[in-house]
């Protein structure tokens, strides 16, 4: 007998098929193309109803994960007594899990069974008595919403999303501030062109416009909160002899509005930077200590998550962010890049040009260690001591390569593990006689060892001489062969030239006759 296990939003349904080998039928689509044919073929054998929405969510999650719940196992116990029974299941994972239960029936889950499930799902309200199409659709919608909420709920794995979004927004803010600052300098530059050369900081430039307004008010404006005293004097002196044009009040209002936007963006950027720093110290403290907040956040954002970055090998971490250069190098068979996002780390920046690749490789290896501890350690210490330890090792390596002391990280002092004190054993005076008696034997053994070492050294020297002589003979032989080949080639070329010349002379003679 064949049974079809159907998972609905209302519960588990076990349908009994009239055809024992329906799953082997070649005309399955034609046999189940109408409601009458499906009702004639399948009859409900058992139904296990879900008690609540929470129960439905729990059972649906178990099916997605390929697990057999106690409720489903209880339902399957009803058909295990039948001999030569076949159970048709839609999910392969679930079929494997049912097989492991050791029930007395054959479990089938392949491409053919999908046609059966398509027909059953289409005419499901007709197969389940007391269930209308609208009831099932409402239950399905509620279960779908529950599964969606269950998948999107807050978890420890999703915390790194905050870092990914924060670093992306930080980059966008930098672009916006730079664009707005450039536009503001060009706009206000018509009125006071000398100011852009004196005040190079964009935020200070915008704050000065908000405070001062037109250049004629520069002399009476207090700029001490924005600029140092020397630069303030230069601004006031330049305002008196400026070559800029006059602007109207409407122009100034619009310029000030833009300057206000720049100041607000800069303040929010600083706040966002502090937030990112605190999140990085909480989620990846050791990586933060090693490469810094910004580089660490960019690595996590590029990999997609902290877990996927922690699973990456050191070689991948080293060139993360330089994928275009890597594939171009592989395509053109040139040297592959030595670093990607790690180039912006302070440790790589301290190295000279020829040593940057070496330090990037060392830093990537230590970053992999720090990442795995941050992402996978069970009892994690958020102090970042491991990050400081590996940073000190990278600095030591950098100092060795560069030939100068570049160490800035202090040594991490950890509490020593407690050692149990035990009583020392008493000195055995009787052992002195045995030691004295064995002294002659020890001298003989040392002499034998020295002789063996001398013999070994002489044998190694002889072997080296033999290999060198063999190499020289081989080189001479190769040179001789090359010389013979060259001579043969030259002889052949001379012979060919001679034959060509003779043929040419014969042709000329014939033409004269």
Curated annotation (Swiss-Prot):
Residue ranges with Acidic residues bias: 438-448
Subcellular location: Nucleus, Nucleolus
Biased composition (Basic residues): 471-513
SUPFAM superfamilies according to UniProt: Nop domain
Residues covered by region (Disordered): 424-513
One GO term describing the cellular component: box C/D methylation guide snoRNP complex
A GO biological-process term: endonucleolytic cleavage to generate mature 5'-end of SSU-rRNA from (SSU-rRNA, 5.8S rRNA, LSU-rRNA)
UniProt keyword annotation of Ribonucleoprotein present: yes
Coiled coil regions, renumbered to chain: none
One MF term in the entry's GO annotations: snoRNA binding
Primary role: Required for pre-18S rRNA processing. May bind microtubules.
Identification of the protein by name: Nucleolar protein 58
């Amino acid at each position: 007998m064949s049974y079809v296990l159907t998972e609905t939003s209302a519960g588990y349904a076990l349908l009994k098929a009239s055809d024992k080998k329906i799953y082997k039928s070649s005309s399955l689509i034609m046999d189940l193309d109408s409601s009458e044919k499906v009702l004639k073929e399948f009859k409900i054998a058992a139904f296990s109803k879900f008690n609540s929405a929470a129960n439905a969510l729990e059972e649906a999650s178990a099916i997605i994960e390929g697990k057999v719940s106690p409720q489903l196992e209880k339902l399957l116990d009803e058909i295990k007594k039948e001999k030569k029974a076949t159970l048709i299941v839609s999910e392969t994972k679930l079929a494997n899990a049912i097989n492991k239960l050791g029930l007395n029936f054959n479990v089938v889950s392949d491409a053919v069974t999908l046609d059966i499930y398509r027909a059953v799902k289409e005419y499901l309200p007709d197969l389940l008595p007391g269930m209308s199409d609208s009831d099932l659709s409402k239950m399905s919608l509620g279960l779908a919403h529950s599964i969606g909420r269950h998948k999107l709920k807050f978890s420890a794995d999703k915390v790194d999303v905050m870092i990914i979004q924060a670093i992306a927004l930080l980059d966008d803010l930098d672009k916006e501030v730079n664009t707005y600052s450039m536009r503001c300098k060009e706009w206000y530059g018509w009125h006071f062109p000398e100011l852009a050369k004196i005040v190079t900081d964009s935020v200070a430039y915008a704050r000065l416009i908000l405070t001062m307004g037109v250049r004629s008010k520069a002399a009476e404006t207090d700029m001490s909160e924005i600029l140092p005293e020397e630069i303030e004097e230069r601004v006031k002196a330049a305002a008196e002899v400026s070559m800029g044009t006059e602007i109207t009040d409407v122009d100034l209002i619009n310029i000030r509005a833009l300057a206000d936007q720049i100041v607000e963006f800069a303040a929010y950027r600083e706040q966002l930077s502090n937030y990112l720093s605190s999140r990085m110290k909480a989620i990846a403290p050791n990586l933060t200590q090693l490469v810094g907040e910004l580089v660490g956040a960019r690595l996590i954002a590029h990999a997609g998550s902290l877990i996927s970055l922690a699973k990456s090998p050191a070689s991948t971490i080293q060139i993360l962010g330089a994928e275009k250069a890597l594939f171009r190098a592989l395509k053109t068979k040139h040297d592959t890049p030595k670093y990607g996002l790690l180039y912006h780390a302070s440790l790589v920046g301290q190295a000279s040009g020829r040593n940057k690749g070496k330090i990037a490789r060392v830093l990537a290896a230590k970053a992999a260690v720090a990442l795995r501890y941050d992402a996978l350690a069970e009892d994690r210490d958020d102090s970042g001591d491991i990050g400081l330890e590996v940073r000190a090792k990278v600095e030591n390596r950098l100092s060795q390569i560069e030939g100068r002391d570049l160490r800035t990280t202090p040594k991490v002092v950890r509490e020593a593990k407690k050692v149990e004190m035990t009583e020392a054993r008493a000195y055995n005076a009787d052992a002195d006689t045995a030691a004295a008696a064995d002294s002659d034997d020890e001298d003989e053994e040392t002499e034998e060892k020295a002789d063996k070492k001398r013999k070994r050294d002489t044998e190694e020297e002889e072997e080296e001489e033999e290999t060198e002589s063999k190499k020289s003979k081989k080189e001479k032989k190769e040179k001789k062969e090359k010389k013979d080949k060259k001579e043969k080639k030259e002889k052949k070329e001379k012979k060919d030239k001679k034959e060509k010349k003779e043929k040419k002379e014969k042709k000329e003679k014939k033409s004269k006759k």
